C-alpha cells in the first residue's frame, strides 16, 4: 500500500519570479507528497547541478520544462511501484539513473523534488508529521529540539541591489526559550530597524531574503545601525541577541590576484588580512557566527581562520562544504571550520542530506539548516531542522511570505511537540 503509484511534476515560479520544479508523489493507499525546490544566487562551484532549459526565448533561459519532463517520464518509470518507506532505495535509484557525480544528467532539482515528495507521502501514509518521519530516518532517540533561528535583517552582496559587500547581517535571539519568543524578538528588532532607516532617509525596500537593503557607508555601518535597533527594541547585545554574518567571500575573491575586495570600502585583502579584518569585527561586536569567511578554494586560508577564530565562534562552511560528505570529511580531517550549512539542493537527495548532517553531528561540528535566496512556500527545511535536531536554522527575515512560511511551520511544530519542548542552547562560543 505504500508503493508509488504515480508522479506528477510541473513548472511553477519561485520568490524571484524564476521557474522552478514542483512534484507530487502519489501512493497506492491515496497518500500524496508535494515538494517544490528553491534556487540560490551565490552558489558553490561544487554544488549538484540545477537543470535549466537554457532557451533564451523563454524565461531568459531559466525554464525547467526539461526537468519536469524527466520527472514525468524517466524518474516516474524508474521508481514506479517502489516502496516509499524505503527512502534510501528511492534516492539510490535516482542517483544511479543520473550516473554523474554532480547530477548533471537529469538534474538535482528533478531528483530532489521527487526525493522530498516521497518522504512527505510516506509521512502522510504513516499518519505522522514530516519532522517525526525525518527523525525516524535519522535515528534520533532523544527529545526533539526547536532550532534557534539566524534572522537575516540586512541584505547585501548578491541578495540585494545595494553597496554592502557582506551578503547577510543576521541576528540570533539567544535569549529566547521558545521559537515563538525567538520570532517575536526578531520581528521587534526588524520593525525598529525599519523605523531607524526611514528616519535617516534610507530606503526601506527589502532584498531577496526579506532583509532591508540600504546603501550604507561601509560594512561596519551595518553593525552600528543594527546595534542601535537592538538597543532601541529593549534588548541587550551579547546577552539577548548576537550577530551572525555570511560573507559569501567567494563573491569577493579574485582568483588571479588571490585577494578579497570590499568595494564599499575600496579595500583589498589577502586571505590572512581578511581573517584579521573579521577577527577585529569579532572583538568589537558580539559576532558569534561567520559563514564562508573565505573563498571555497582557499583551504590554507581557512586553516588560519579556524586556528584564529574557531575556538571563539562558529565558522560555517556553505560554499566550502556544499552539503557534501566527501568534502566535509576532508574539512574535518584538516580542522577546517567547525560548522556546516545544510542546503538540500546543494546535494540533491534527502538521504545524502541526512548523511551530511549525521557526519557533522558525529564529528562535533554544528549544523545549520538553510533556505536559498530564491525560495518557494515549501516548508520542508523547518521539519528537517527539527527532525534532525540540527539546532539552528537560516530562513531569512520576518518578511516575505516564502520566508515567514518556514517560521510559521516552526510555530506549528513547537505547538505539536508541547510546552516542555526546548530550543537549542548548546553554544560554545565566547561573547
Curated annotation (Swiss-Prot):
Protein location: Cytoplasm; Secreted; Cell surface
Subunit composition and interactions: Component of the RNA degradosome, a multiprotein complex involved in RNA processing and mRNA degradation.
Any single GO BP term: glycolytic process
Residues at which Mg(2+) binds: 246, 291, 318
Record protein name field: Enolase
Required cofactor names: Mg(2+)
Listed Pfam families: Enolase_C (PF00113), Enolase_N (PF03952)
GN (gene name): eno
Cofactor mode of binding and number, as noted: Binds a second Mg(2+) ion via substrate during catalysis.
Annotated transmembrane regions: none
Family the UniProt entry places it in: Belongs to the enolase family.
Residues binding (2R)-2-phosphoglycerate: 167, 343, 372-373, 394
Chief localization: cytoplasm
A Gene Ontology term for the protein's cellular component: phosphopyruvate hydratase complex
Catalyzed chemical reaction(s): (2R)-2-phosphoglycerate = phosphoenolpyruvate + H2O
Molecular function (Gene Ontology), one example: magnesium ion binding
EC code(s) of this entry: 4.2.1.11
Function: Catalyzes the reversible conversion of 2-phosphoglycerate (2-PG) into phosphoenolpyruvate (PEP). It is essential for the degradation of carbohydrates via glycolysis.
Annotated metabolic or biological route of this protein: Carbohydrate degradation; glycolysis; pyruvate from D-glyceraldehyde 3-phosphate: step 4/5
Keywords associated with the record: Cytoplasm, Glycolysis, Lyase, Magnesium, Metal-binding, Secreted
Entry annotation: catalytic residues: 209, 343
Name of the top EC class for this enzyme: lyase
InterPro entries: Enolase (IPR000941), Enolase-like_C_sf (IPR036849), Enolase-like_N (IPR029017), Enolase_C (IPR020810), Enolase_CS (IPR020809), Enolase_N (IPR020811)
